[in-house]
Amino acid sequence: EEICGTHLVEVNAPDRCLVRKVEVIKEPGAIPRDMEWVFVPLEIICRHYLSGSAWRRFQRGELTAEQLGVSEDCEYGTKLSKPFLEVTTKFEKFDRNISNEEALEISNITEEELNEIFSVVLKVDALIEREAAKNGLIHVDGKKEFALGPGRKVVLVDTFGTLDEDRWWDAEAYANG
């Protein structure tokens, strides 16, 4: 299923691959608008269940029930009515949740490019969810990173569907409470 390009050139061993180099510009707002093969200095988190840091922020009132599409009295692990997308910084000492407006400033990408990244995240997560369900798993949330490749098309430059990048729950255990 073709969702977007990647920087993968070839798998050259069972545990190695060759990828195309992308330029990394760490200075906020300094990426030229016409540059190709450039890393987008943002991390996109897609949440499907209320857990982890989102749960803690919800408890502190930093995220609202309305934002998340849940009831005020929901519990940890509640399935969200629709995926909840968040953007965090990439080159700060600690990842920091930011607004879409700040994301556009930091990355100097266009709103159209950011929306295309969001679209790709949702498509990748739908694929992960389908495959995980076949194996008795629930895909709770995950994070992804991107670059802009030829013609500034969105390119996935991160692993996904791994224990490092995604959170998983056992579907049977979840169903049993």
Predicted regions and their residues:
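Residues forming anionic-ligand binding surfaces in small-molecule and nucleic-acid pockets
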Residues: Y76-E111
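A long amphipathic alpha-helix within ATP-dependent nucleotide-binding catalytic cores
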Residues: I109-V140
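A structural signal for short, well-ordered beta-strand segments and their strand-loop junctions
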Residues: I45, H139-K143, L156
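Catalytic activation segment of kinase domains across protein kinase-like and atypical kinase folds
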Residues: K144-G177
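Active-site loop/lid in soluble adenylation, ligation, and acyl-transfer enzymes
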Residues: E1-T89
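Short, surface-exposed linear patches
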Residues: E66-V70, S107, G177
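A short glycine-rich, hydrophobically flanked beta-strand micro-motif that places a catalytic Asp/Glu
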Residues: G5-V9, A132-L148
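Coil-to-beta-strand transition motifs
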Residues: F39-P41, G136-H139, P150-V154
